[in-house]
Amino acid sequence: MHNRIADCFARLRKKKRKGFIPYICAGDPTLKRTVDLAVALEKAGADLLELGLPFSDPLADGIVNQLAAQRALAAGTTVRGVFDCVREIRHQSQIPIVLYSYLNPIFQFGADKFHRAAEVAGVDGLLILDLPPEEDSLELDRLNRSSSTLSETKQDLVHIRLIAPTTPTDRIKKIAGGAKGFLYYVSREGVTGARDSIATSLPEKIAQLRKFSDLPIAVGFGISNPDQAREVAQHADAVVVGSAIVDLIAKHGDKPEMVEKVGAFAREIANAIGR
């Protein structure tokens, strides 16, 4: 089995390029618009897509992403609906998709069933925000079980690991040793959301991560404009931009020009990091 994420980063390495990973919340403002946004973001230069599964109590998210989840849930978005949305995206695009979720909706759906359904729908990676370190191995077992029940023609579903500025060195070694796809480094402590500047410790932290893993390193949380994206791309292999995009969606709502506005902003980010 293979994985679109690994293939994507292999292409980026070959072209000596950095990756652009936008975040959007599935169902905000509607699942149909989510499909439109995914296609538009890829055309604008996105290399991977981080797709949020809306949840009513997103503790790691700032107010912008919290409100996006509320709008999506109010619009009737469900886990099954998100998987259907991924299938629709797959009719038009093969962009790697990482599903950004909390544990609660996964357990409510049924953990094993969730992993199988995600893989069948066309999800390439899972990023579980509140997964306790002690349960990492349990989630990996589920991923392995779901993969073993599917045809070899299916994509391999991987669990993306988060590393924070406060993660101890021994824990970084353990996380990096079992990681696949890429490492997601949280650039700042706290929740998601735009910041005025990038942490000065970022170059040092990324250099430390590279001592423990050859995997690509994506940096997210707080990157909100082209200048910040360009700065982060000097050190990381990929840049994640979320709240700034979600804020544009909120400002323009379910209108045709919303997709165009998001695409234009995404193009600025992609150009800044050397698309």
What does each of the following model-derived ranges do?
Residues 207-215, 224-234, 238-275:
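Alpha/beta catalytic cores of nucleotide-metabolism and tRNA/nucleoside-modifying enzymes
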Residues 1-94, 108, 177, 254-261, ...:
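Conserved N-terminal beta1-alpha1 strand-loop-helix module at the mouth
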Residues 32-39, 170-176, 223-239:
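Catalytic cores of alpha/beta
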Residues 2-6, 11-12, 57-63, 77-84, ...:
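Active-site-adjacent beta->alpha loops and helix N-cap segments on the catalytic face
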Residues 51-56, 125-127, 132, 185-193, ...:
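Glycine-rich phosphate-binding active-site loops on the catalytic face of alpha/beta enzymes
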Residues 75-76, 123-135, 158-167:
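Catalytic beta/alpha-barrel core
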Residues 67-68, 75, 162, 172-207, ...:
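Glycine/Thr-rich beta-alpha phosphate-binding loop at enzyme active sites
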Residues 20-24, 49-51, 97-101, 126-128, ...:
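Hydrophobic faces of well-ordered beta-strands that scaffold small-molecule active sites
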